[in-house]
């Protein structure tokens, strides 16, 4: 089951885990990985589940993008911390975008790629259980997936 243990953790704890995991992994496949500078803050949620959510978003960015660029941008607004994963080479169409958080849904770009169609659906369930949100947009051939965390 998708249980979450709500507590408080620092944004830097979350980002350090993500950077440690992906710096080497992405350099091995020659993907440029960039994490923007950010102001540390306390977040409300489940640290391990938050790591899972970001890993899932990044794995999708690698699988369905062109593998050239993964950028993570961080911003704060309205008492929330936004973490946006941007990837180049988005092959999803605008008409498919509204469906990416549905269970078992897979885009036309997923034909030769392994997956269950559950990743982003689970991410959304987890973000909602932590009081947050997740959304996506396509701009100029880039895919942006943003996880919204509640600040303490």
Spans of model-derived segments:
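Short alpha-helical Gxxx[C/S/T] motif in the catalytic ATP-binding
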Residues: 119, 123
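Short helix-loop "hinge" at the ATP-lid/N-box region of the Bergerat-fold HATPase_c
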Residues: 61-62
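Conserved catalytic submotifs in the C-terminal HATPase_c
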Residues: 5-8, 32-42
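Short beta-strand/loop element within the Bergerat-fold HATPase_c
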Residues: 69-79
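A conserved beta-strand-to-alpha-helix junction within the catalytic ATP-binding
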Residues: 5-20
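Short conserved segment of the HATPase_c
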Residues: 92-105
